[in-house]
Amino acid sequence: MQDLRPRGYCSRWDFILERCANRNVLHLGFIGETDASLDQKVDAIRDEQTLHSQLLKVSSAVTGIDRNERAIEMIRSKVGWNNLYAADVERLERLDLDRTFDVVLFGNLVEHLSCPGLALNGIQRFMNEKSELIISTPNAFALLSNIRFTLGRFREGDEHVTGYSKFMLQTLLQRHGYAMTELFTCYDKPPLGWKQKLQFAIGVPYFKAMPERGGTLLAVSRKAA
């Protein structure tokens, strides 16, 4: 049985940006900010507060896919980004895009999908034997989430329809033709403001010592042989 102990606890953004440096990236659900209004989404992108904004600075090329066609139109007109496609990640076979990528980024998206297996099946054609699929999703056994739930203070994401433990995520990947090669837990965005930075300074050493309880799962996979 595969050893599923996380290799460590890290910054999700730092890990992804390092892995995607000088590589050709396909970013699924690139807009992010799912609980924000349309204007807030576009403002975050224009102000370079999104992961996709940072990917454009370090990657050799980035292609973005998102189902929010209206937001994509606004981003093209207000921010000037190109290489964007409006598509449903659960229907990628309908997308007129015929190439492979070094990295397929599937970050904080799988928990939003009614049929995640359809998305994983559709991703296969964008990968070759050397491509990496990077998935992140909330950890079902995250310590802080479990504490908040016990205290009646937990709030689920507005569009979340499922959750994953490391075991469930591995099973999902295997069922759809992927082999998990690395597993970490992580925190999502870099801390902003002194209060967040203080909280991180206190919490990060604990989660580095016990990464099983980190808030977000971060898995790297390849096509199964």
Show which residues each predicted segment covers.
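Residues at the starts of beta-strands that form the adenosine-phosphate
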Residues: 24, 45, 60-61, 132, ...
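Conserved beta-strand/loop positions that form the S-adenosyl-L-methionine
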Residues: 28
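A short SAM/SAH-binding and catalytic strip from SAM-dependent methyltransferases
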Residues: 103-115
